Curated annotation (Swiss-Prot):
Pfam families linked: Bac_DnaA (PF00308), Bac_DnaA_C (PF08299), DnaA_N (PF11638)
Keyword tags: ATP-binding, Cytoplasm, DNA replication, DNA-binding, Lipid-binding, Nucleotide-binding
Location of region: Disordered: 87-109
Assembly information from the UniProt record: Oligomerizes as a right-handed, spiral filament on DNA at oriC.
Chain positions covered by the region annotation Domain III, AAA+ region: 114-335
Organism for this UniProt entry: Cereibacter sphaeroides (strain ATCC 17023 / DSM 158 / JCM 6121 / CCUG 31486 / LMG 2827 / NBRC 12203 / NCIMB 8253 / ATH 2.4.1.)
Protein name: Chromosomal replication initiator protein DnaA
Record's function text: Plays an essential role in the initiation and regulation of chromosomal replication. ATP-DnaA binds to the origin of replication (oriC) to initiate formation of the DNA replication initiation complex once per cell cycle. Binds the DnaA box (a 9 base pair repeat at the origin) and separates the double-stranded (ds)DNA. Forms a right-handed helical filament on oriC DNA; dsDNA binds to the exterior of the filament while single-stranded (ss)DNA is stabiized in the filament's interior.
Domain of life per record: Bacteria
């Protein structure tokens, strides 16, 4: 197989997998040889080879076969030496250009995700569900001595995690213009890591990330299951902590609940301050709507919003803040276009689809299924007679959630739990209420299940 043939195979793969996948996962491959139905490739890391094997092996085999070089399997090996032309190899991609000596990371290399100018502390509405997270973020933004490291913010979609991280970055840049503050998503961290591997600039990557004063990584759950990225993240984390540099992390769940995240990383993340942004309550939703409405009154001068509309929306739209703000944006835009006052009737007509989605009722059957999945028990045990602690406690959790999240009466809930008496349901509900005060794991379980059911 000639170099020209491999170039043609690569061109076919580009069309098949798309440019982003090609640049990230196919372009770095170096075909070292093809013999007895086995294509051998050199890859930057074992993780890289495993990923290509799982996601692109079929495409590569198909293109090689079409080019007249049928293969049965692919093999990947990591080379610790710089790439150079190998005369003995039957087919080889053009050699990569040699790695360049890299100076200290310049300021322009410290580019992360763009910060949203709207996401400041002034625009963040504080209420009971997020007051601790807000206070902790304010403390970090003051830029004083590092008191907790990392600050770990977690919660469901649209509860303010990203807003607070942007606000911290904005404040730090104002207070300390010379500080090296880097904010980016975990996906961007992985992409830049893979890019550094591909370009043989991993030392520059390490130097860049370990030279920052504040590292902020959003949605860290993204790196779960990605072994090489987790390895680099772990060492970057340790290096910054050793230098007493501030780290701020966010995720959609607590560190201990992130599946496939290495235990040593979970342990590190739990060493600092872990703060939950709880689902919004009525008062917080109303405050957010009032702030947003004040902003729109400036934009749409002369537009009138009737009494009770904001209260109605705060009661009805309980999913997350993004949906809530989006509903108000649509309402003001619609009223402006048609030249009408924003009344309750107009809101109901204009937002009918959002209101219908928000009206989705949680059923007892859904609760039983989610709780059974969470505790890894059979669904039939929810209504069965078994009294083992490993079954009885999840059953009581489901009873408690049925009482909290559905309008069903205790006798009706009892019937859905295998015909149990209403006093049994009441006992289960009270037992969970008592345990919540002392059992933090149970409280976390309930918070997670509630979010899953109301998502």
């Amino acid at each position: 197989m000639t170099n020209e043939t491999w170039v043609q195979v690569r061109e076919g793969l580009l069309k098949r997998v798309g440019r982003n996948n090609f640049v990230t996962w196919i372009e770095p491959l170096r075909l070292m040889g093809l013999d007895e139905g086995v294509a051998r490739f050199e890859v930057p890391t074992l993780f890289f080879g495993d990923w290509v094997q799982r996601n692109f092996a079929d495409h590569i085999r198909m293109r090689l076969t079409e080019a007249g070089s049928p293969v049965e399997r692919l093999e990947f090996a990591v080379s610790n030496t710089p790439r150079a032309p190998l005369k003995e190899v039957k087919a080889a991609a053009p050699a990569a250009s040699p790695a360049r000596a890299r100076p200290a990371p310049p300021e322009e290399d410290l580019r992360g995700a763009p910060l949203d100018a709207r996401f400041t502390f002034d625009s963040f509405v504080v209420g009971k569900p997020n007051e601790l997270a807000h206070a902790a973020a304010r403390r970090v933004a003051e830029g004083g001595p590092v008191t907790f490291n990392p600050l770990f913010l977690y919660g469901g979609v649209g509860l303010g995690k990203t807003h607070l991280m942007h606000a911290i970055a904005h404040d730090l840049q104002k207070r300390q213009p010379g500080a090296r503050v880097l904010y980016l998503s975990a996906e961007q961290f992985m992409y830049r890591f893979v890019q550094a591997l591909r370009e043989r600039e991993i030392l520059g990557f390490k130097e860049l990330f370990r030279s920052v004063d504040v590292l902020m990584v959003d949605d860290v759950q993204f790196i779960a299951g990605k072994d090489s990225t987790q390895e680099e993240f772990f060492h970057t984390f340790n290096a910054l902590v050793d230098q007493n540099k501030q780290i701020v992390i966010s995720a959609d769940r607590a560190p201990g609940e992130i599946k496939d995240l290495e235990e040593r990383i979970k342990s590190r993340l739990q060493c600092g301050l872990v703060v939950d942004l709880h689902p919004t309550d009525y008062e917080l939703r109303l405050g957010i709507l009032q702030q947003k409405a004040d902003f729109y009154r400036e934009q749409y001068r002369g537009l009138v919003i009737a009494d009770g509309v904001l209260e109605f929306l705060a009661h009805r739209i309980t999913t997350n803040v993004r949906v809530l703000e989006g509903a108000l944006t649509r309402l003001f835009a619609f009223a402006s276009l048609v030249g009408r006052e924003i009344t309750l009737d107009l809101a109901q007509d204009c937002l009918a689809d959002i209101l219908r989605a928000s009206d989705r009722k949680v059923t007892i059957e859904e609760i039983q299924r989610k709780v059974a999945e969470h505790y890894n028990i059979r669904l039939s045990d929810m209504i069965g007679p078994k009294r083992l602690r490993t079954i009885a406690r999840p059953r009581q959790v489901a009873m408690y959630l049925a009482k909290q999240l559905t309008p069903r009466s205790l006798p009706e809930i009892g019937r859905r739990f295998g015909g149990r008496d209403h006093t049994t349901i009441m006992h289960g509900v009270r037992k969970i209420e008592e345990l919540m005060a002392t059992d933090s794991q149970l409280a976390d379980d309930l918070q997670l299940l509630r979010r899953l059911l109301q998502a």
